[in-house]
Amino acid sequence: MNLVLMGLPGAGKGTQGERIVEDYGIPHISTGDMFRAAMKEETPLGLEAKSYIDKGELVPDEVTIGIVKERLGKDDCERGFLLDGFPRTVAQAEALEEILEEYGKPIDYVINIEVDKDVLMERLTGRRICSVCGTTYHLVFNPPKTPGICDKDGGELYQRADDNEETVSKRLEVNMKQTQPLLDFYSEKGYLANVNGQQDIQDVYADVKDLLGGLKK
């Protein structure tokens, strides 16, 4: 079962990804985890990636793609994988196609969790964090018992600077522009499966399981 998971910030990718890997026994592979592992193991590509990251620069595609190729060639990917955060561009998607063709592991589905922008705005701007213990709340989905106060220690709750409406709106616009060509690419390939992410978490996952039902575990 070879899957790519897509969705805008706040769509619930992390939650659905955790459930998929738990139920189907495949590794959850994120770009960040791959970079960290390659740097920790001090592979040639990992060291090259580190040299860019240490300078605050973007890691070039050829290095990222090389790290992805190494990761997908490991034994735990024999029965499949869930890729999260890669690919981000059509060029990366084309490179991934070549890697998977070489390994004989074609993509089964690209699962895109769809959520309207106004719903994402509500989800992302409603987050509040305790200034003392760091516990995260949400004004709509997980509010504190007393507004503005942490249930655990009475600490004052604050909103992160990058959770304000203007910043979140800009971030979503950038993500939407970057993601659309990728969705078009996978739609043309016949891999794309859109899932309604505006339902309850359990209902979203029920739709994901229905989609994956025809695939071997």
From Swiss-Prot:
Catalyzes the reversible transfer of the terminal phosphate group between ATP and AMP. Plays an important role in cellular energy homeostasis and in adenine nucleotide metabolism. Keywords: ATP-binding, Cytoplasm, Kinase, Metal-binding, Nucleotide biosynthesis, Nucleotide-binding, Transferase, Zinc. The keyword Kinase applies. This is Adenylate kinase. Zn(2+) binds at C130, C133, C150, D153. It catalyses: AMP + ATP = 2 ADP. Pfam families: ADK (PF00406), ADK_lid (PF05191). It comes from the Bacteria. CDD domains: ADK. Disulfide bonds: none annotated. Belongs to the adenylate kinase family. It comes from Bacillus subtilis (strain 168). SUPFAM superfamilies: P-loop containing nucleoside triphosphate hydrolases (SSF52540). It is found in: Cytoplasm. GO terms for biological process: AMP salvage; nucleoside diphosphate metabolic process; nucleoside monophosphate metabolic process.
